[in-house]
Amino acid sequence: MLKINNIRFGIRIVTYPRSDGNTPILLRKTVDSVLSQSYGNWIVYLAGDAYEPASEFNSYSSWFPQGKVRARNIFADPERHKFKDQRWRLYGGISAINKCLDWMHADGISHVAILDHDDIWNHNHLKTLADAYTQFPEAQFVYTAGRHASMGVLPKNRDVQVRYNNLPPMEEDMLHSCASWRLDNIPLRYRYGCRSSGEPQCGDMTMWQDMKSFMREHNLRFYFANKETVFHDGM
């Protein structure tokens, strides 16, 4: 029987006040999916992206058991204020995300698990990641499959075996909340990027491109765990 290493995941959640007022409803579902995890060695880093009212953001900490959340409202020139065109949606949250990753790294978090504030993890998500890091200890980036409400299960090509498949993430073929990596070994941060046409592209797409280049340059390994463990409803 596989003996899981004592991996403590830092769960990165960045949230902001949606214009439709639905942040508390969606975030509650996201948090409930964390609380339902069968793997219990985790702590949430909950970052507000210039979240106002601050009292609403502060109330979210009460949803967690004691010692299971660290919360900080980050005021770092949020993209939704900086950009007035489509870039605010494509680049939204990058400044706060990077501040949160820096915070986690300073706290000594070795494994980061990404969870967007409107996504839901299946109860076995962290267990799947922990199993993968234990069975394949050279893996520096582990991700799972996820279901998008309108696009179906991603990635589309899932014909892989349980081994070091070294399958890198495809920019438009994975859900952001499926990703995890060794924060202690990978110093990358999100940035504003563009397609070859010069059009701006989503921040996580640029991150996966940078991740593939970094991993290739440093001869590091990916692992794709072929289980569907994340849901995104596309709202």
Where are these regions (language model features)?
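Conserved donor NDP-sugar-binding/catalytic core segment of glycosyltransferases
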Residues: 127-156
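Short beta-strand-to-loop acidic/aromatic patch adjacent to the donor-nucleotide binding site
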Residues: 109-120
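A recurrent flexible, glycine/aromatic-enriched loop bordering the glycosyltransferase active site
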Residues: 161-179
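Short beta-strand/loop segment that forms part of the nucleotide-sugar
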Residues: 41-51, 74-76
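Active-site-proximal specificity loops/subdomain of glycosyltransferases
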Residues: 56-109
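Active-site donor/metal-binding and catalytic loop motifs
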Residues: 147-155, 177, 223-235
